[in-house]
Amino acid sequence: MESIEQQLTELRTTLRHHEYLYHVMDAPEIPDAEYDRLMRELRELETKHPELITPDSPTQRVGAAPLAAFSQIRHEVPMLSLDNVFDEESFLAFNKRVQDRLKSNEKVTWCCELKLDGLAVSILYENGVLVSAATRGDGTTGEDITSNVRTIRAIPLKLHGENIPARLEVRGEVFLPQAGFEKINEDARRTGGKVFANPRNAAAGSLRQLDPRITAKRPLTFFCYGVGVLEGGELPDTHLGRLLQFKKWGLPVSDRVTLCESAEEVLAFYHKVEEDRPTLGFDIDGVVIKINSLAQQEQLGFVARAPRWAVAFKFPAQEQMTFVRDVEFQVGRTGAITPVARLEPVHVAGVLVSNATLHNADEIERLGLRIGDKVVIRRAGDVIPQVVNVVLSERPEDTREVVFPTHCPVCGSDVERVEGEAVARCTGGLICGAQRKESLKHFVSRRAMDVDGMGDKIIDQLVEKEYVHTPADLFKLTAGKLTGLERMGPKSAQNVVNALEKAKETTFARFLYALGIREVGEATAAGLAAYFGTLEALEAASIEELQKVPDVGIVVASHVHNFFAEESNRNVISELLAEGVHWPAPVVINAEEIDSPFAGKTVVLTGSLSQMSRDDAKARLVELGAKVAGSVSKKTDLVIAGEAAGSKLAKAQELGIEVIDEAEMLRLLGS
């Protein structure tokens, strides 16, 4: 059995290794939850044996050493981290400790914020001008990232307003919105560059580039949450008051900061943020709870590495470790072959996960994944679980290579990978049962033809029994034929037939989206429908004409043109129309006759809207004569940016396109 000294040494060595990977290399190997568990284990042992605590123990400092490639900045006021709690019981215990330490009847008000998952930085302003910026580093010394921080548009180079202190050091988090993260990885996959595991790594990698020109191309943003140095000036005596003052001086502050008058209100805030988490547009891993009164903060003081007056209340872990038992290959509706990892089941963010996507062959190669490997699994919001990285330091000896198929695992047709594309595809087309199933599932989905009650299991049976080969065959189904399916009684069968009859009345945009043309999503389908007005006009359009539609470039135009050039596709469309599928004749909207600031403009929505849904906003804009596109290009006239807008906003600013916020959009919609 190991001695206590050996256990402590092993834990410290392991934690230092993972701190180095996380803070210095921006390449964490284990989930945060596993790091937290190891740290708790070390802290508990040291609490029982305080005589064995060493000055260099991970419990006695904040982070890891800075990279030698950057010059260093010593923090005049140390940048401490926060202690964590992981459940309501632990938070209530923290709340009681605070009340007991204050030893007074004075009321405690809590200031609650989002715990952003990015990179902590300090920014020093002298006479209102940004003079330096640094990472947290080890809490005492950080890396000089001034040149890179100056490229972040959210951070003012000069504060504005009155009574700005002579020296003011603000602290906050640089992070990357999810839309920007996806765009960076999409570009990297296309060009063979580095693909990041998550937005936090991407933000850290972007901020710590030696070439600021690379940082400038990344859509980083920033929220401030505190102060370090303060000289030659005053700030309000509450935490919220300081944040509001920062905002007046032009510094970005999250609009989700909330005052809570009791522990019950704090818990309600925590659960509301947890509920809203998937729609925020950026990653958070909990909430931060601070005493609002600066006087009470000073009274409570600090422990070795954290303040006594604040705590991070973390959400259930979104990353866990498990083993890959096998890799199987699925076939999508366009023939895309997607590798899927079959996992030893593990609970991630409250959900039992047994499968995770591996995207494509390049991703398997990037990960260096082998069957039998120990891996980190991530699940964020409604996103399909994915493998973040392989824990190479714990690779078993009996792992096996993942072999990508050369023939379709469903129909046996050749698998083809077009040069320049990451995705390999089955060449079988509709002779492939898997493609047929997925195409039909897409056709009946809610945002396409919206056939109520026609679920995946019904489609699977219809294809397997050879009842349905094309979408048009769906409308030939009878209640009698459907009754023969598993768990389908006469009443349910008649309901499906009625739903199919109802679905025949649709819109041109929904019909186009339902056809499943490659690269044609809802926004593009709506744009094509609005531009051409009729199916006949769209079918006859050339590639050049198609590119005149907002959000349609050469790739999408080619896919659309090729789809309608294929005789089998035209035959299916003819059959659908013959079965009674129809939509209203186009209403020609003359932008010149509409009295609206949006009339005739190509508009792009980005970020999260708080006052109305994105669908409602799109519908309202179209009513007022706008064309709503899905991406920013030189054809774009206006970008409406909600909270945490990402790469689309950055591109709009780069192209000099007019940008307004949600409040201005609502004002114009009402004008």
Swiss-Prot record:
Domain BRCT: 593-671
Binding site for NAD(+): 32-36, 81-82, 113, 136, 173, 290, 314
Residues the record lists as binding Zn(2+): 408, 411, 426, 432
InterPro entries: BRCT_dom, BRCT_dom_sf, DisA/LigA_HHH, DNA_ligase, DNA_ligase_AS, DNA_ligase_CS, DNAligase_adenylation, DNAligase_N
UniProt KW keywords: DNA damage, DNA repair, DNA replication, Ligase, Magnesium, Manganese, Metal-binding, NAD, Zinc
Molecular function terms from GO: DNA binding; DNA ligase (NAD+) activity; metal ion binding
Single GO BP term: DNA repair
Reaction catalyzed: NAD(+) + (deoxyribonucleotide)n-3'-hydroxyl + 5'-phospho-(deoxyribonucleotide)m = (deoxyribonucleotide)n+m + AMP + beta-nicotinamide D-nucleotide
Needed co-factor(s): Mg(2+); Mn(2+)
EC main group: ligase
SMART domains noted in UniProt: BRCT, HhH1, LIGANc
Domain of life where this protein originates: Bacteria
PROSITE patterns: BRCT, DNA_LIGASE_N1, DNA_LIGASE_N2
Disulfide partners: none
GO cellular component, one term: cytosol
NCBIfam families per record: dnlj (TIGR00575), PRK07956.1 (NF005932)
Role of this protein: DNA ligase that catalyzes the formation of phosphodiester linkages between 5'-phosphoryl and 3'-hydroxyl groups in double-stranded DNA using NAD as a coenzyme and as the energy source for the reaction. It is essential for DNA replication and repair of damaged DNA.
Family as reported in the entry's similarity comment: Belongs to the NAD-dependent DNA ligase family. LigA subfamily.
Name assigned to this protein: DNA ligase
Gene symbol of the encoding locus: ligA
